[in-house]
From Swiss-Prot:
It comes from Drosophila melanogaster (Fruit fly). GO terms for biological process: actin cytoskeleton organization; actin filament-based process; anterior/posterior pattern specification; branching involved in open tracheal system development; cortical actin cytoskeleton organization; cortical microtubule organization; cytoskeleton organization; determination of left/right symmetry. It holds the Pfam family ERM_C. This is Moesin/ezrin/radixin homolog 1. The gene is Moe. One of its GO terms (molecular function) is microtubule binding.
Length: 578
């Protein structure tokens, strides 16, 4: 390695990259190396951020050597690759999946750390999209209780404000997660951002400033323009200036001057605590204004090609998605059919077992009947024998008319005894005959049942041999554009591209919840659910401000429309009097 080579570590939202650069390497050369490595083409949104020697976060200057910038001396040198500028509408502007992912991760982190205020009900809904983006479709078999225990999904503020256990939070998020079934991970990220961009603090860079009266205020710089906030409320801007009203920005030391297009309006002037703050404000104003104007012009060839490629990729992905959905539907049908077969097979087995039991009972009954018939036949044989013996005795009696009286009496007694024995045997035969008839009836009934059971078993057996087919499919899933960087010292002035015919985009802008009835109902239901466990003693200042804004029917865009009313002069005067 050359002795002049320097080690550099660049942290993106989901990776760490390490490079060796030369002492002559510029910010742009390092930036280009990063975007080439991660495959990013929408470079205009991003920048390299570092911590300077004073501990402040600063954006690297592209056309200045890295070593000549006030980077904190470490080995390796530390940089963060972050979104510097935000789109007006994520759904319209973000082209590449990598761009979408980086924005999603950065915005999600800002919400979880409370850098962007997000009300509790919106936090839970966003968490459900975050789970879909990370884990895909909910699966009740693998995604059991405790599955989300290690995922960071909600701002700590929201958790602290509600008397809910971890399991209850998880169940709430999983309930909404199941609503997103079949949604691609990229689509879940996009839905997350579409909701997040309606949050008041989304995409705003805040700077501490003072007006001429010395009142401490906040300046907010974002994709739509400049806004002024009171010191204790960064949710609700009080005065707004769209980019289309501004023709020049400049600063002299700590004083920052904004010249409106309206020549009759006075300059808009404020004071920053340090000159370096004014440099950052100037750079952000220039970059946001440039992108604001660029959106209102035809796309460059590069962007057209990028969008065409993205459309092709999305169409291909859509086709794959449709194939996947068809495969999933086929799998569900096959699984349902298989379950039906298994249920029928189980029923058949139960019926066959029952038939087997009935058959065994019938066979046992037949054995008993056969035994009974044998006994009956033996009794009949014995009866016949005794009747013959009796007949012989009677014949002897008839022949022995001349017998002695004693012998005759003895013979008569023997005949009477034999008659009684014959009667007894006759009674037994009659009883056994009745029992035999009853058993014959039972056997006949058992045989009928056996025939019915055999027919049913045969039918079930025939059904179980129907061919089964299971089709299971699985599926998952440079041109450089210059970023404007303020490299200013002393008095700096920049004229901005203007067009008096540009319509303020805020005029027709509505929040997604206002435009989407389903989302509106989801948030309303979540708010009602969370209200039952809310601990009002844990409310923050932002919670109270948000609640009051909702009570008065305000949202991000309604507020912006309200504070941009009237001519520029009136708003400048209003600022001076704050």
């Amino acid at each position: 390695m050359s002795p002049k080579a320097l080690n550099v570590r660049v942290t993106t939202m989901d990776a760490e990259l390490e490079f060796a650069i030369q002492s002559t390497t510029t910010g742009k050369q390092l930036f280009d190396q990063v975007v080439k490595t991660i495959g990013l083409r929408e470079v205009w949104f991003f920048g390299l951020q570092y911590t300077d020697s004073k501990g402040d976060s600063t954006w690297i200057k592209l056309y200045k050597k890295v070593m000549n910038q006030d980077v904190k001396k470490e080995n390796p040198l530390q940089f963060r690759f972050r979104a510097k500028f935000y789109p007006e509408d994520v759904a319209e502007e973000l082209i590449q999946d990598i761009t979408l992912r980086l924005f999603y991760l950065q915005v999600k982190n800002a919400i979880l750390t409370d850098e962007i205020y997000c009300p509790p009900e919106t936090s839970v809904l966003l968490a459900s999209y975050a789970v879909q983006a990370r884990h895909g479709d909910h699966n009740k078999t693998t995604h059991t209780a405790g599955f989300l225990a290690n995922d960071r999904l909600l701002p700590q503020r929201v958790i602290d404000q509600h008397k809910m256990s971890k399991d209850e939070w998880e169940q709430s998020i999983m309930t909404w997660w199941q609503e997103h079934r079949s949604m691609l991970r990229e689509d879940a990220m996009m839905e997350y951002l579409k909701i997040a961009q309606d949050l008041e603090m989304y995409g705003v860079n805040y700077f501490e400033i003072r007006n001429k009266k010395g009142t401490d205020l906040w300046l907010g710089v974002d994709a739509l323009g400049l806004n002024i906030y009171e010191q204790d409320d960064r949710l609700t801007p009080k005065i707004g200036f769209p980019w289309s009203e501004i023709r020049n920005i400049s600063f002299s030391e700590k004083k920052f001057i904004i010249k409106p297009i309206d020549k009759k309006a006075p300059d808009f002037m404020f004071f920053a605590p340090r000159v370096r703050i004014n440099k950052r404000i100037l750079a952000l104003c220039m970059g946001n204004h440039e992108l604001y104007m660029r959106r209102r012009k035809p796309d460059t060839i590069d962007v057209q090609q990028m969008k065409a490629q993205a459309r092709e990729e999305k169409n291909a992905k859509q086709q794959e998605r449709e194939k996947l959905q068809l495969a999933l539907a086929a799998r569900e049908r096959a699984e349902k059919k298989q379950q039906e077969y298994e249920d029928r097979l189980k029923q058949m087995q139960e019926d066959m077992e029952r038939s087997q039991r009935d058959l065994l009972e019938a066979q046992d009954m037949i054995r008993r009947l056969e035994e009974q018939l044998k006994q009956l036949q033996a009794a009949k044989d014995e009866l016949e024998l005794r009747q013959k013996e009796l007949q012989a005795m009677l014949q002897r009696l008839e022949e022995a008319k001349n017998m002695e009286a004693v012998e005759k009496l003895k013979l008569e007694e023997e005949i009477m005894a034999k008659q009684m024995e014959v009667q007894r045997i006759q009674d037994e035969v009659n009883a056994k005959d009745e029992e035999t008839k009853r058993l014959q009836d039972e056997v006949e009934d058992a045989r009928r049942k056996q025939v019915i059971a055999a027919e049913a078993a045969a039918a079930l057996l025939a059904a179980s041999t129907t061919p089964q087919h299971h089709h299971v499919a699985e599926d998952e899933n440079e041109n450089e554009e210059e970023l404007t960087n303020g490299d200013a010292g002393g008095d700096v002035s920049r004229d901005l591209d203007t067009d008096e015919h540009i319509k303020d985009p805020i005029e027709d802008r509505r929040t997604l919840a206002e435009r989407n009835e389903r989302l509106h109902d989801q948030l309303k239901a979540l708010k009602q659910d969370l209200a039952q466990s809310r601990d009002e003693t844990k409310e923050t200042a932002n919670d109270k401000i948000h609640r009051e804004n909702v009570r008065q029917g305000r949202d991000k865009y309604k507020t912006l429309r309200e504070i941009r009313k009237g001519n520029t002069k009136r708003r400048v005067d209003q600022f001076e009097n704050m």
